[in-house]
């Protein structure tokens, strides 16, 4: 009888250990956490501004002290790091229409539209790179099965990114 109880306890302990291991692995591989780790690895420091699209597997982060911007795709497994001098500008695109723009040497096209019913809000970053001249990141996409945030929050994040880019391009 003691052996049966011992076996039952060992099986229960093994099941608890496996469950705990699976939960820790699931937590570690969570898309947002994984993208933040990839940004940290590519920039070398925690980004001071970040934009994440876990459903697309894309992210962008700014490091002001290191004067660099990182753009990642393929769930953070691929990406590029650009110096601030290589940034040409950025745009906010709502449902296929450019609603705000910042470009080197041009006046800013201010965001004068708040679209609470937008289907898609995209941040496009433009670089002086012939191979990868632009990077698009969906800040909001109504077609995705899981929604986080709202179109208004996405527009505010995009406007904040354009403000950062404008300050970098002027400075």
Task: Enumerate the predicted regions with their spans.
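Anionic N-terminal interaction surfaces
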Residues: 3-76
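Ordered hydrophobic segments in well-structured contexts
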Residues: 59-61, 68-71, 81, 122-124, ...
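Short, isolated positions within intrinsically disordered regulatory regions of eukaryotic proteins
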Residues: 31-32, 77, 144, 165
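Short, charged, intrinsically disordered terminal tails
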Residues: 2-6, 168-171
């Amino acid at each position: 009888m003691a052996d049966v109880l011992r076996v039952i306890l060992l099986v229960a302990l093994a099941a608890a250990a496996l469950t705990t291991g699976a939960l820790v692995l699931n937590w570690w591989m969570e898309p947002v956490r994984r993208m933040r780790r990839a940004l940290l690895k590519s920039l070398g420091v925690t980004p001071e501004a970040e934009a994440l699209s876990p459903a697309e597997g894309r992210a962008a982060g700014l490091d002001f002290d290191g004067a660099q911007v990182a753009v990642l795709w393929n769930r953070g497994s691929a990406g590029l790091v650009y110096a601030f001098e290589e940034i040409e500008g950025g745009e906010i695109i709502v449902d296929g229409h450019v609603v705000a723009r910042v470009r080197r040497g041009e006046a800013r096209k201010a965001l004068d539209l708040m679209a609470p019913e937008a289907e898609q809000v995209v941040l496009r970053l433009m670089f002086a790179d012939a191979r990868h001249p632009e990077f698009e990141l969906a800040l909001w996409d109504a077609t995705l099965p899981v929604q986080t945030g709202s179109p208004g929050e996405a527009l505010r994040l995009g406007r904040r990114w354009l403000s950062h880019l404008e300050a970098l391009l002027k400075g």
